[in-house]
From Swiss-Prot:
This is Lysophospholipase NTE1. It comes from Lodderomyces elongisporus (strain ATCC 11503 / CBS 2605 / JCM 1781 / NBRC 1676 / NRRL YB-4239). Inhibited by organophosphorus esters. The gene is NTE1. The chain crosses the membrane at residues 60-80. Residues 1-59 are lumenal.
Amino acid sequence: MEEELAIEDLPRLTGTVSLNNGLLHSIYNETTVFKILRWSLVEIPKYILKLMSKNLEINLNVSSILIITLLIAAGILVIVRYKFLTGYSEDIKKGGSNANTKALGQQSTNYPKSTSSGLFVEKSKDKKPSNYLDEFLMAIKVFGYLDKQVFHELTKSMTTQKLSRDEVMCLDEKIGFLIVVEGTAQVYTKVTKKSNRNKYDELGQNGRDEGEEADEDDEEEEKEVGDDGDDEMDVEAMRNRGNGTKNGKMHGLDTDNFEENDDFLKLGEQNYQLLNEVKSGAALSSLISTLDLFKPLKSESTLTPLDSMGSGVSLNLDYLDRAGARLKALENDSDADTRDSTYPDIIVRPKKKKHSDTITVAIIPQSAFERVQMKYPKSTSHIVTMVLTRLYKVTMTTIHNYLGLTGEIFKLEIELNKSCELGLPRYLVDGLIERLSQGGSNERKQQAKHFRRSPLERTQSRYVLLNSRVKSNNPGDLLSSVPISRDDPKLRVNKSSAPTLVDGSNRINFTDNIEETEENSLRIAIIENIFKIVGINEAQNLPHEQAPFRSLNSSANSSSIALNSPGYFSPNLPATTGRHHNVLKFSSNDSLMNTISLSQLKSQKTHSISRGSTTQKQLYKRRNPITEMNIKDAFAKVMELKYIEPNTTVVQQNSVFCGLYYVINGSLEVHYKQAETYSKSATSKHVYTVGAGGIAGYMSCVVGFRSLVSIKTPKKTGAVVAYIAKNDYNQLLDKFYFLQLPMATKLKSLLSKQVMTIDYALEWCHIPAGNVLCSQGDLANGFHVVLSGRFRVVRKEKRKGSNRDEVKVLGEYGHGESIGEVEVLTASRRSNSLIAVRDSETARIPRTLFEILSFQNPSIMVKVSRLVASKVLSSEKTLSQATHSFITSSSNESFISADYKTITILPTVSGLPVRDFADKLVHSLKAIGRNVIALDQALTLTHLGRHAFDESLVRLKLSGYFAYLEEEYETVVYICDTPVQSNWTSTCISQGDCVLLLADADDQYTASSVGEYEQLLIKMKTTARTDLCLIHQEKFVVSGSTSRWLKNRMWVQGHHHIQMYIERNNETIGPGKKSFINEMAAKFVQNKSLISKFEEARSKALSWRREEQLKDLTLGSHKSDFLRLARILSNEAVGLVLGGGGSRGISHVGVVTALERHGIPVDLIGGTSIGSFVGGLYAKDYNIVSIYGRAKKFSKRVSSVWRMIFDLTYPVTSYITGYEFNRGIWKVFGFTEIEDFWIKYFCNSTNITNSTMDIHESGYAWRFIRASMSLAGLLPPIAFKGCMLLDGGYLDNLPVMEMKRRGAKHIFAVDVGSVDDRTPMDYGDTLSGFWVVFNKWNPFSKHPNVPNMMDIQLRLAYVASVNALEEAKRTPGVYYLRPPIDNYATLDFGKFDEIYQVGLGYADKLFTEWENKKQLPEIAGFVKRDGMQNGGERIKMYRRNTM
């Protein structure tokens, strides 16, 4: 029991013990707290009081105090010096990526250009279409942009023909239009007897003789150029070309071995030579042959159109089916002439390939073209326009400008006048001469007397009153009271054999009056003669609206006009009978079905039976058809009668403003002056004479060619002519479009066989922007003549020490230049790649055509040889300059002609003053002597006129219009003044050789983003040069603001700073209390009449202000930003190059001051060493006042002795640290970047890491100017991206060649370097130092100037610079200046004013002397071009000096 109690009491005891322990622990903790409180409140204050009550003494002497003070001051200086005064070096950490430079040869520069070039070189070529339809669609583009109905009409009767390798096809273009849809066709032309075998043997020697290379070529595949580019010959043909000429014998001329050489073919006894190769997707027929397919109707009745289509149209392939029989018959023929005439002129056979040796030809038959002519006559005129456009742009341009066969074009007009010499009745001519003779002596002194008949002033009398009664061909006095016959009895044609345009039964009076005057008859007779000459002399040449097809002409583009139709004008023939005759008459021989809508015929037949002749009258009244007399009336209205005095030039050579001249009396002489000798001293040669009844200016009007000749009157006699202006002539042809076909047909009949051959073989290549014309390494089988557009020459080279290829831009080809003759004549591969900068067109001359023409006309070979020789000489000159140059520059800048033909002005965002900018730029271009035109959407629509909304013609008209403007004007400015979605915006971008991208410099949002116009620019992938034009309100650039624009714009290659006022919209302030002024403004806004008056007054004031600004633009200041931009864009830029020379470079400030005083503009600035400093100051502000002050401030800081002493360091790398020098430059330039400079600027430095000369055009200005001024030993090199940069003067102390690469035409080069000591030395083979020291102090020594070690090191360092200076002096266009500053040392910065006055006095005196002697360069916009040679005075320009 007790045990249980004891166990129960155990927890109680345990709880008591734990309670006691807790109590003790709490007491202990309270004791610790008390201890802490006692120490903090009692002990520590007691100890502090005890310590403070003691006395502490420190004994220091004065030296110790000074030392401690100096140490403290040194520490503070070190902290301030390296912590707070090195802010200019923070750009390495902050903007290291921003400071991109063209330095560092290891790193690629000019990123956008290299990237774009490489992209288009590496781009895979577009795949060719693989089916017949795609090939056909490619070839049908030669007709232009056809309507859907016309396209279906041409294609629904199309057939195909397959040809194997052992078959030969006679190319008879009368059967239809032929297109190669599969394979490659070889076209051969007949070799005449004049071209003997010896000549062809000589041709074969130009081939390749390397057997190994030919064997390698045999294994390669055929290369093709995309997008109608250079159709290269395959490798087998190139091998045969070289190997087929062994032992002086052409295999192609051997009957047994003709297949071994594709260049020649023997068919029976007739030899053929390869003319061209036509690949799939190209037309086999000539485009001009289409004119023969629109065959005029030969039936006697104009209401039977199906008669002309009755004969079946079949493919004439006699040389395929009956080749053996024909060849056998020809072999037995002994007459060579008969044999030559029997063989076809052109034959076609497939080209042998590895996979297939057959071709498939699609044939559009002649009947299809006849149906198109009948149903859609307007579309027929579109095709004729395309034919004439190609004839002018490709054939005639190439013949005249490149081949030099201008005589063939002259023969055309001579044959025209010989074939039709149509005179006028003598009584009409005598009456006109008598009226002209009564004009009076005062009027006769004028150049020409115009007799243009006003539409209202038709006649002065209702009866004919003849002024001439002499020898009238019409006897009797009744002539004075009856209408005059306009037919000369001598020139009348038998109407039964050939129906003329004027039918006697249907003659309608010319005027609105009942009777005609003598002048009216004269005009009608002249027009009739002109029509007969140009081919409009038969009724079948005009369109006839036929009854069966009239209902089909529902399209707006196919409204045919009825001329001379008996249904309208012949009352003798019932219309109903004619219709029934037409409907029921079909041809049984039609091999190609002619479809007609039966429902339309049935309804028309019922309609005609019910209405009868009444319908004809209603149709006549409603449609008011055009008659032949209306046409003659229209031409007669625009015709002028002129009397031209003797020895008067009517049309100047190369003039566009010409017309058609019909000689009434007297004669006109045609003179020609060759292009090579076209100058004021050259004399023109008389070509032929146009007598009475002939016409002059035919080619200019019909084809659209500019006048190739000068038209003059004889020295002793004048001429009476009828004149139709070219513009009036073209407008009338557009109105009466059906006249184009007969006129074009007449033109084709006049072309010689040689011209037809050239037209057939020439290729019209269209290369879209960014596509490759020919690639590097391709076989050269033809050369190109640039018709329009621009091509960039790119070469791909392997970079040293890297597997990557480096793309180098070599130059650009523009309008009128030729490409690829050297490779063709040397039978080599393409050495470069050609990329289309914009949509371009070329005329490709195949190698085979060139060889044929060269044997027929040796003058062509001579001319092309001269052209090739000049190109080779220019390339050798460039190569020699590169070989003799001792400088390896890391700059990738190669000279590309900036003479841009087309300039596009494109805004970044909407709302920018594009129109004002364009007006000022165009005015500046005109001020520098450029023939320029500004083209906007309104002007383009005005030119297109009624064709503006015709999709089938608008592109052809636009391309022809743009090509015409490029030929007529030196520069065409495209103004993009439309929204982004507009077609005109895309047209402007695609047409520009150079795109000027306008941007508001203060627009921070657009600077960091991409504008909507820029997005379109990127989307179109244009390769044209793009320059950013930053528009500033004031002539000031915020530091670092330009790089913000350029950082993310890889597509921008350059930039310009332009000062121009921009109107900004006032920002609206928040709502507030309405004032009296606001209420009045609100009332004013509601009054529309006041608003209209205000806008009218405002527009007048703004226009007046704009005119005043444009007038004062060039004369007001030689520092005009628009003049500077115009000179840069026109290769007329003025460059200023300032050389290095230490303190002697202060004279640069004086030279710049003299330039300002004489009003000489500066567009580009470059410099070395101290020249980079002064040039940078001038480029930054373009103000001489600020330059003088800042240069003097820098000189004072550098010449401070104490600053240099404190900057001294232990001379391991240099004597001074460079801190004071760096800070002195930074104090002047601050954080300004080179991109912020107002004028384009560059400086050079010597990269001792890569052993190159680096060119700096971007980055912080102070850093690279300091690098260019880093004299070795005195200053440490500037470290930039791992490379050490020193003074640029070690390699080129006067970088003139670098300025030349940037397109500067006139360069003022100022040299202030030390004179190179070239005293001869002869001190033997050994040299004692003691002897050198003795000779320096010996006044009688012959060798006092023996160099020491430092002199030798300096001379060694400047070896390259000395040679570069001598090369710069010999460079054309460089004006070398050297002020007399040899007496000043390199570090004489303390003599600032003295050196400045030396440079100012020298330059001012020199420029004044040049002005007096007329030796100053003819700077564009500064010197009147026409006044310089005639003693014209220089334009005086003044300026207000401001900071």
